[in-house]
Amino acid sequence: MNRKVAFITGASRGIGAATAVQLARFGYDLAITARTMSEGESHEHGSWQSNTAPLPGSLESTAERARAEGAQVLCLRSDILDLDSVAAAADGALAHFGRVDLLFNNACYQGPGNMQRVLDVELAQIDNIYRGNVQAPVLLVQKLLPGMLARGNGAVINMVSGSAINDPPAPADEGGWGFAYPSSKAALIRLMPALRVEHADSGVRFFSVEPGFVYTEVMRANGLDEKIAARFNATPPEHVADVIRWLAEDDAALEHHHRAVIFAPQLHGKLFGE
């Protein structure tokens, strides 16, 4: 029996890594991408100002955990700000596995501009945010969706944000959020209804998932402590991974296909009682 193949961006840590391991456990082989191939590498991840301190997690560590679950794993270094590397990763996955059954656009731009006020954010930063959060996912859809359509099945799942659909409670530097990042995620949300109507009855499912507040390595590195995270009732990455797997696999998930955004913590509670 052929194993399905999932293509996951931002799989070196957090939700991406948890989803990779969960899908491996349920019989998927994996093409996983991120900037960080090995532990200890340095990449930009500061939302307010530049921060290149190494973060825990890497493609190699995710692959080790997924292989322990029986998966074949292809690690592909890719930066969503470098669209050539994004295209090369998709081509590499297709060349290696011959197919992709699930595209999980999980990676998002990490860098200055995400949390700036409108009068402070630079246009070059907005360019980066939209390249990483909109253009890169669309490029992957253009690369990987045709094969799903030809087979008559598959799934495209985008990770979005509550900031794209809710008003900020305060300015970006006072506990709220800025304009550029939420608007890019709003664009990503609007991608899915377009795909649904363009490919109705194709056998391919399209979902946008809002993970809730997930306390990630990036947040920790940028100064958000565990006490604040606890106050926001943080969602474990593994719970989001459970939801991603269910949406991609279960026929009952099609009951949610019309919804603009799936709120992962709420759906997880209904499905798994936690």
What are the residue ranges of the model-derived segments?
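The beta1-alpha1 cofactor-binding region of Rossmann-like NAD(H)/NADP(H)-dependent oxidoreductases
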Residues: A53-G57, R77-A89, L123
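Catalytic loop of short-chain dehydrogenase/reductase
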Residues: Y109-Q110, D120-A124, A155-D201, F213
